[in-house]
Amino acid sequence: VTNSIFSPLSNPQVHRQVLALAIPMVLSNITVPLLGLVDAAVIGHLDHAWYLGGVALGSTMISVTFWLLGFLRMSTTGLAAQSYGGEDRKQLALVFMQGSLMALLFALVFLIAHTPIADLIFGWSDASAEVKHYGMQYFSIRVWSAPAALMNFVLLGWLLGTQNSKAPMWMVIITNVTNIALDLLFVMGLGWKVEGAALASVIADYSGMVFGLMCVWKTWRERQLPSPQKLLTSTHHGLGRFVKLNRDIFLRSLCLQAAFSFMTFQGASFGDEVVAANAVLMSFLMIISYGMDGFAYAMEAMVGKAIGAKDRQQLSASLVGTFFWSLAICLGLTALFGLAGSQLIAMITSIEAVQQQAAVYLPWLVVMPLASMWCFLLDGIFVGATKGKDMRNSMFVATSSFFVVFYLFAEWENHALWFAMTSFMLMRGIGLGVIFLYQWRKDTFLAQC
């Protein structure tokens, strides 16, 4: 039985398929933290700290809002991959149109309501008047990227669903490189300060959208999909399923945001050195996320395609191949953090007190790659299978476990936070794993998609 389970590992085609989808997404993800570093470096060289504080405050508001709407990418990937695998050209086209309409609708609502939303959130902030002023300045310009940013979710998801990971990679790279270049031009060259940083991000998002639309149009013609005009009267077909899937993934995202936000805010109550140490360790946790996300995206595309084709053998090969490479990456990260964790911390901060605090909590980071691997992979499986309800329910359980563990071990202070985060990652994997194994053994996983 064991030999039959792992037999796909002897097939070079399985490894090529996994790596062809995963590596471009990992490479594009690497540009995301690079963009943040360049933004901070450019604004940080201006003559007052409140410029950097304002950009940080405004960009956080935008980032959290857009991140919560990231369900548009996940749902589009799963549904497009299933349509692609089932060779249903009309449904493949409808998925793109429905996703686009939903993205533009959310963008319109955000543009209409952004002023009262900003007034409310900035009113809650304890930041200085200068930081609030520049934060609002950044936000009021950056908000106009909403149509492009949300459309980019749909474009990325649809292209990935059609088993094309190179186009999404270049979309992300073009967006981020454009942003970096315009940051340098507008802020350092023309002296536009905060307005320049915001405008650079807006133009970058639209440049990525234009490139993505060109890639979609190319695929549309190659696959001979029906023209959008012919489908205008059919956009309601399957819309109920699309809306329900987006609702469930949105609720899942809210729970995820609640856990990570609590980690940040609660850590601040344990002192400046502790919150700084957590920030250093969380930056490494983001590296784990960016690396594993590439394999999760590959899993989404391959699982969705296999389900669309009703091909259990192809599905098994996708699962085993992605598991193998994910395990290899996680073992490598565990070894890296275990053997060179102190040196990595020293590269991030030269403050001795922060280094000492980070070293205290480093063991939690060492176990995190293997603890979190399962939730990333299973997220990919369930996104590809468009099982939003299962993802939502398992996330409810995992988030509850996060808060229960923290309050049960609250006397451990920051160790309790890291224990809660580790249990959160484990419970996400365990919850989805139990559901998956039950449905797989009952032979209902494919049937219920």
Where are these regions (language model features)?
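Helix-terminus/linker motif at the lipid-water interface of multi-pass membrane proteins
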Residues: 34-53, 122-129, 185-194, 250, ...
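Residue-level hotspots within the lipid-embedded alpha helices of multi-pass solute transporters
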Residues: 29-33, 67, 107, 111, ...
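Small-residue-rich hydrophobic transmembrane alpha-helices
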Residues: 52-112, 149-168, 277-335, 339, ...
